[in-house]
């Protein structure tokens, strides 16, 4: 379970997140929702330590994330798929996946473990294209690669920032099915920023609604009312 209490984040004089508090229950999917520019991505970056933030509590299970350096957080079972995918375009698909593996020989920077077979089972296209360069993949294939890379350390918490943004519909369906499978069959805790209402309805066991850096509503997925949708999500 991810527990956040009174999290605040500022850029200079701009206060971006205001006393955000919620829990992402274990083995459930929690959707962070809200219009563009309300602080959703900043919230995920704060959890991963990529932006400075202040909080009374920021814990994953019994691990105090406030005491963990950003580069150490993945080794405590937290995987993060950011916006933009951050694929290495000149590396092969296989080498992009291996980037997520721990270094066994620090002097040679050697990664001796193989890519877990379950990655290729989840995303068969990555096996078919594992010797192709990451830059040769379509946007949807790159997103599958980014998710696969996040999974190589077998995390307990998977954090995704708009994983279906700008992707062709057939791959959106594939990615959504994988997220549901990881959550429902494999028992991963999932925290996902999502904008598409039909996917929120499909994925969300719980939701957290952000508006101008404030948490204005939260609850179980079926408690996301039409009034909340019209007030905070409609364009």
Which stretches of residues belong to each language-model region?
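ABC ATPase C-loop
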Residues: 150-151
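ABC-type ATPase nucleotide-binding domains, specifically the catalytic core motifs of the NBD
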Residues: 12, 68, 93-114, 122-124, ...
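Helix-to-loop junction immediately C-terminal to a conserved catalytic motif
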Residues: 48
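Conserved ABC ATPase signature
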Residues: 133-137
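Conserved ABC transporter NBD signature motif
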Residues: 56-64, 76, 112-116, 219
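The feature captures the beta-strand-to-loop junction immediately N-terminal to the Walker
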Residues: 33-35
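Catalytic Walker B motif of ABC-type/P-loop ATPase nucleotide-binding domains
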Residues: 158-162
């Amino acid at each position: 379970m991810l527990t956040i209490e009174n999290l605040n984040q500022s850029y200079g004089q701009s206060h971006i997140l205001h006393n955000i508090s919620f829990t992402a229950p274990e083995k459930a999917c929690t959707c962070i929702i809200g219009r563009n520019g309300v602080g959703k991505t900043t919230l995920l970056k704060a959890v991963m330590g990529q932006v400075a933030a202040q909080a009374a509590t920021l814990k994953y299970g019994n691990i105090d994330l406030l005491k963990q350096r950003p580069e150490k957080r993945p080794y405590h079972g937290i995987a993060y798929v950011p916006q933009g995918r951050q694929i290495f375009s000149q590396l092969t698909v296989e080498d992009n996946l291996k980037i997520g593996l721990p270094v066994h020989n620090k002097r040679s920077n050697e990664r001796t473990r193989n890519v877990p077979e379950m990655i290729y089972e989840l995303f068969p296209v990555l096996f078919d294209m594992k010797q192709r360069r990451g830059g040769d993949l379509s946007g949807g294939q790159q997103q599958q690669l980014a998710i696969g890379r996040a999974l190589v350390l077998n995390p307990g918490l998977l954090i995704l920032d708009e994983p279906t943004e700008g992707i062709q519909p057939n791959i959106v369906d594939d990615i959504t099915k994988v997220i549901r499978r990881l959550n429902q069959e494999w028992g991963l805790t999932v925290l996902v920023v999502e904008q598409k209402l039909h996917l929120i309805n499909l994925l969300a066991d719980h939701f957290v609604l952000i508006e101008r850096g404030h948490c204005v509503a939260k609850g179980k997925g079926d408690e996301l009312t039409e009034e909340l949708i019209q007030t905070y999500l409609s364009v």
